[in-house]
């Protein structure tokens, strides 16, 4: 990678730390999730939730959203300056579900943001603990990635819906910092940049004046983040062109869309972290586990181990399949929405099916849904094996391109081939190789054409038994080479709407 000297591990970004050694990183990540756990326990006490109610993932999500809203400085400021009817800018809340006489009831609660901030800080040794907030944002983002499709958003920015595997983190808020930037997919960054350029085309003052200077700095920073995700010199050179453009316009949009398409084969490096719902950390803290002392990692065995020993429940609508609901949450917990289903199935130990075959809607329940018919069931979040999360796109041997699939962005560092339909992808690259970036485009297309679907990625990497915490005996799975493994085939999920 380019900036080897200054690169921080994504645990460090997650905890806002400078360079630390492995033990310090484990301790600071442990401190972060321990703080989330303590906060959750305190909120359950405040709300008088029973043990069962506290393990309900819908209650966990409401509590997480409340603390995120309480710390959303920009939105809080905006709400105070633009008072809207029926919204108290100083309060936050949401639905809490309680078990009453064998039925589930919804209760809407409202809290002072100041009070929530106080409880959060108290759980985090008096600090703002921004890292913990980002961690919750990434968990929500991973849940959205597994639940919704972004076809409409892709089409609106002129991209192809088949590029959905590049959209990791597309619902992360802007304020999610370095840890958030690390988990954003190539498509997400391209989309943010295209939106920005389009605003500049429509609003001539966008790049001008004092505000314009700040906008420009943000634009160049986003370009650099995206550049850092690409692994080939030609893709990076194209990003330099886009960044240095005096007056970004349609030519830059074209270049960005070209780069996004190229990332289907020349994949970018996108980090993956297992971020769990707050109630899981709460359960562990309540049972006396000391995260800071034991240390914790988001990319190793720890989250798997935590999920082996946690019982989490979910509300289930009348015609939903509890096993499918479990799969959805399992994928979200391991940030595996864009992983090859063959790999996920092997690790989980039960077959993971494409989203088009799931009989389940999202985890959150809308306020107009009838609670009378709601049931609840245990989420099966355990796994057969564990594997190390990756931040590489799985391109084989360093600089060369490897076969990418039209919809996979590997999560686990496990050996596999990446089957892809080269014809489908290459069809998108006919024609336009003229203009300033022609030599780079030609080079990128050449690399893509030389990629072979039978190449093996993550050579020699395997999964591990849950008893093998030091990762000493890798088990390298063998996969059916022909089997296409994308979660998004035959997709009928609902769109993500804010």
From Swiss-Prot:
PTM summary: Late in virus-infected cells, may be cleaved from a 56-kDa protein to a 53-kDa protein by a cellular caspase. This cleavage might be a marker for the onset of apoptosis in infected cells or have a specific function in virus host interaction.
Superkingdom, taxonomy of origin: Viruses
One example GO MF annotation: RNA binding
Compartments in which it is found: Virion; Host nucleus
Gene Ontology biological process: symbiont entry into host cell; viral penetration into host nucleus
GO CC annotation: helical viral capsid; host cell; host cell nucleus; ribonucleoprotein complex; viral nucleocapsid
Keyword set includes Iron-sulfur: no
Pfam family, one: Flu_NP
UniProt short sequence motif Unconventional nuclear localization signal, positions renumbered to this chain: 1-18
Chain span(s) of sequence motif Bipartite nuclear localization signal: 198-216
Keyword flag RNA-binding: yes
Predominant location category: virion
Renumbered residue ranges of the record's region Disordered: 1-21
Keyword terms of this UniProt record: Capsid protein, Helical capsid protein, Host nucleus, Host-virus interaction, Ribonucleoprotein, RNA-binding, Viral nucleoprotein, Viral penetration into host nucleus, Virion, Virus entry into host cell
Function of the protein: Encapsidates the negative strand viral RNA, protecting it from nucleases. The encapsidated genomic RNA is termed the ribonucleoprotein (RNP) and serves as template for transcription and replication. The RNP needs to be localized in the host nucleus to start an infectious cycle, but is too large to diffuse through the nuclear pore complex. NP comprises at least 2 nuclear localization signals that are responsible for the active RNP import into the nucleus through cellular importin alpha/beta pathway.
Family of this protein: Belongs to the influenza viruses nucleoprotein family.
Assembly and binders: Homomultimerizes to form the nucleocapsid. May bind host exportin-1/XPO1. Binds to viral genomic RNA. Protein-RNA contacts are mediated by a combination of electrostatic interactions between positively charged residues and the phosphate backbone and planar interactions between aromatic side chains and bases.
Protein name in the entry: Nucleoprotein
Species for this entry: Influenza A virus (strain A/Mallard/Astrakhan/244/1982 H14N6)
Gene: NP
């Amino acid at each position: 990678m380019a900036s080897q000297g200054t690169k921080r591990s994504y645990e460090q970004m997650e905890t806002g730390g400078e360079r630390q050694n492995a033990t310090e990183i484990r301790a600071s990540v442990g401190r972060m999730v321990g703080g989330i756990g303590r906060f959750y326990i305190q909120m359950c006490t405040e709300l008088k939730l029973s043990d069962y109610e506290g393990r309900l993932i819908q209650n966990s999500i409401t509590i997480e959203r409340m603390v995120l809203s309480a710390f959303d400085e920009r939105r809080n400021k905006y709400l105070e300056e633009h008072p809207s009817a029926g919204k108290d800018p100083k309060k936050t809340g949401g639905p809490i579900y309680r078990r009453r006489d064998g039925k589930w009831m919804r209760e809407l609660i409202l809290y002072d943001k100041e009070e929530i901030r106080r409880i959060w800080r108290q759980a985090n040794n008096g600090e703002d603990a921004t890292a913990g907030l980002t961690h919750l944002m990434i968990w929500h983002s991973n849940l959205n990635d597994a639940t919704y499709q972004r076809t409409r958003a892709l089409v609106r920015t002129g991209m192809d819906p088949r590029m959905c595997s590049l959209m990791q983190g597309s619902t992360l808020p802007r304020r999610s910092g370095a840890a958030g930037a690390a988990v954003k997919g190539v498509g997400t960054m391209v989309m943010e940049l295209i939106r920005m350029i389009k605003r500049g085309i429509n609003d001539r003052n966008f790049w001008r004046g004092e505000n314009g200077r700040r906008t420009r700095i943000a634009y160049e920073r986003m370009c650099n983040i995206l550049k850092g995700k690409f692994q080939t010199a030609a893709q990076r050179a194209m990003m330099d062109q886009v960044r240095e453009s005096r007056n970004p316009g349609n030519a830059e949009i074209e270049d960005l869309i070209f780069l996004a398409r190229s990332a289907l084969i020349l994949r970018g490096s996108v980090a993956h972290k297992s971020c769990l719902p707050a109630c899981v950390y709460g359960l562990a803290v309540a049972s006396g586990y000391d995260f800071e002392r034991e240390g914790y990692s988001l990319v190793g065995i720890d989250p798997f181990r935590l999920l082996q020993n946690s019982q989490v429940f979910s509300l289930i609508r009348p015609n939903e399949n509890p096993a499918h609901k479990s799969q959805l949450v399992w994928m979200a917990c391991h940030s595996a929405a864009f992983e090859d289903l063959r790999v996920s199935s092997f690790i989980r130990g039960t077959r993971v099916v494409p989203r088009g075959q799931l009989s389940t809607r999202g985890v959150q329940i809308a306020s107009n849904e009838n609670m009378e018919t709601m049931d609840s069931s245990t989420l099966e979040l355990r796994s057969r094996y564990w594997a190390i999360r990756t931040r590489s796109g799985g391109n084989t041997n360093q600089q060369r391109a490897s076969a990418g699939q039209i919809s996979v962005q590997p999560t686990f560092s496990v050996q596999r081939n990446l089957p892809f339909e080269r014809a489908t992808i290459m069809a998108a690259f006919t024609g336009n190789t003229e203009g300033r970036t022609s030599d780079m485009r030609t080079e990128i297309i050449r690399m893509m054409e030389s990629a072979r679907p039978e190449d093996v990625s993550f050579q020699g990497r395997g999964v591990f038994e849950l008893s093998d915490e030091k990762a000493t005996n890798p088990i390298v799975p063998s996969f059916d080479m022909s089997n296409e493994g994308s979660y998004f085939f035959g997709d009928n999920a609902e769109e993500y709407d804010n």
